[in-house]
Each structure stands twice: as C-alpha cells, then as structure tokens.
Amino acid sequence: MNKNRLVWIVAAIGTVLIVSVQYCIRTIFESRQPLETIPLLQGILHLTYLRGGAFLSLFNNNVKQLLILSRIGFILFIIAVTFFISWLLSRWGKEMMKALQIGVGLILAGAISNTVEQIIFNENAVFIDFRLFQIPVFNLADMFIYLGQVISVIYLVFLGIKFAIKQWRTN
C-alpha cells in the first residue's frame, strides 16, 4: 500500500468531498417545498434534485429482512472490492504511474461515497443536470467514477502504445 499511497489519498479526499457535497445538496433541496430546479447556467447546467436508486427499487414490498440482508451484502461487497484492489496494488511489484493511481483513487472515491449514501439514506440522490446534452441527471460520485475510468483507460492505452513502439524499435 505504501508504493501506491496516492490511490488511497485521492480515494479518502474524494470520498469526504463527495459525501459532504451530497449531504449539503440533500439538506438544501429537502428544506425547499416544492422541490425545484436551480439554474446555474440557464439552459445549460442546472441543479435538479431527484431521489431514488435502482438497487433499493428491488425491494418495493418493504420486506425488512431482505433490506437488512441486502445492506449487509452490499457493505461486504464494497469491503471485498476494496481489499481486492488493495491486494492488486500490493502485488503490482512497483509503483504505478501517478495518472493510474489518480484514476483508481477517483473510482474508489465514487464507489465508496455512493455506498455510504445508499447505506445512510437508502437511496442515491442525483442532482447534476446538463440540459445542453441529452444525458441523465447524475451525482458527483458518478462523475468521479467516470473521470477515473477515462483517466485510467487513457493511461493504459498510452502505456500500450508506448510498449508497442518499444517492441517495434527492438525488432
């Protein structure tokens, strides 16, 4: 873990940032009645508060035991994924490049904060609404996951190209 500590620093800071922002957004919107959208850039970017989450919509019948079991399973799954990533990082053999550490850290921050929100509120709230593009409303955790994926994929593609060029030059 020491070799790739930037992953954990980015994950910790990102998680605190995301959970804090999402808590503030929930507090602001749930104190307003009726719920309304707040234009940040009119017609382009709005804060639109929507509650829900696909995971808990599976349990619409209010079956308490299933809900408790699903939460426990969800928590255990996230813990297992975190330990798996930690194990992979320790087996990497050498320090990962900074870009990949940041990408993995962003993905972890988004996943952990979505999990925290799901556990505390029984749902995930989405609020970032790009009106300029036809995309679903999303939250900050989703953005961190997406950005982490983009950074990681770009890094791995360039790493592959660099390796291919090196192989080509040696032949």
Predicted regions and their residues:
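Alpha-helical transmembrane bundles and membrane-interface segments of multipass inner-membrane proteins
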Residues: M1-N171
